[in-house]
Amino acid sequence: MFKGEGPERKVSGLLFYINNMNIKQFVVNPFGVNCFVLSNDAGDAILIDPSVSNEREEEALTRYIEQNHLTVRHLLNTHLHLDHVLGNAFVARKYGVQLEAHEEDAFLLDLQEEQSQMFGLPMREPSPGLGNTLAEGDAVEVPGIRLQVIHVAGHSPGGIAFYCENPGEVNGQKNVPPLLFPGDILFAGSRGRSDLFGGDDHALVSGIKRKLLPLPDDTVVFPGHGPTTTIGDEKRWY
């Protein structure tokens, strides 16, 4: 959870292209969640935290998927705080996919109404339950894209990061940096809050130091809120 800029925030749409992988970023809902659409050249797509919260955001996401002839294969959540799950029901119903997240965050799905009242964040439709649980060492794959699951508790008990160790070539160059999608575990110059529903700052800092900071310095980090950063840049804060 991270402070947003209000309900009139525009749906932005940054696009990155790395060999066989397209990365489309939308900023959605009043809390400014970064939603990512990863796809290969064959049109297989992975959605990370697609927390669209109104018709305008749903239409922007749908339009991108349809215009690029994508087939959604996976619906992933880095964690299950309300601001990251607002679009789960829409995506699951429209594209026929199941929610995939860590089982230690499953209890948060029973607290959606409580979270909605706490943060004043309207919930159009509750998220469905977990369809597939992800744990440390698992991998989520479509041809040409492999995301390794890294479990880092502390922001939430079941917080996970998705690590792409080998994104492939760019313009024939093989030295392409790894990619990390840590949700609210790690931000540019900061980390996630730990005062919500089972949070633990000691566990969060420990997990970041043990599991994320040892990654290559040039790893590009796409956080759950805010701008991109690198692991090398974040090491100075720890």
Residue spans of the language-model regions?
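Short acidic-hydrophobic surface loop/beta-edge motif
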Residues: 16, 26, 38, 137-142
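Positively charged N-terminal leader segments that act as targeting/secretion signals
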Residues: 1-15
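Conserved beta-strand hairpin/beta-sheet module of binuclear metal-dependent hydrolase folds
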Residues: 21-68, 161-168, 172-174, 178-181
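Conserved S/T- and glycine-rich ATP-binding loop of Class I adenylate-forming
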Residues: 38, 78, 152
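Short Gly/Pro-enriched turn/cap motifs at secondary-structure boundaries
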Residues: 26-28, 129-131, 151-155
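Hydrophobic/aromatic beta-strand patches that form the interior of the parallel beta-sheet core
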Residues: 24, 76, 100, 132-134, ...
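Metallo-beta-lactamase
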Residues: 45, 52-53, 115-117, 139, ...
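Active-site HxH/HxHxD metal-binding segment of metal-dependent hydrolases
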Residues: 53-58, 62-141, 145, 166-170, ...
